[in-house]
């Protein structure tokens, strides 16, 4: 049995696709809310958690899909589950005009709640950093 898909939706307080897109698709934007440092070189995003003088966790993700102002899909390089990836996409509410950030990720059944909590924390940092 493989990892299970998790779908999460976060309503945002903006109507600007470009503002949200910058936060979810660029190394600079991701660095504001996902990790301490993020770099992008030839479609490989490297995420570093921790500071230089402490223990660090470094993971890399390969860019699989990129559709501007729509979605970005990445796959952790060390993930052996062929079907697993993580994706962030933006949609607009027909009712309010505000945007929603959709997260798709994959986790083992016993780790789904922990992964959801991790994304909740990431989105709290996004809100604090950008007001979204």
Can you annotate each of these PLM segments?
Residues 31-78:
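Glycine-rich portal/gate segments that line the openings of hydrophobic small-molecule binding cavities
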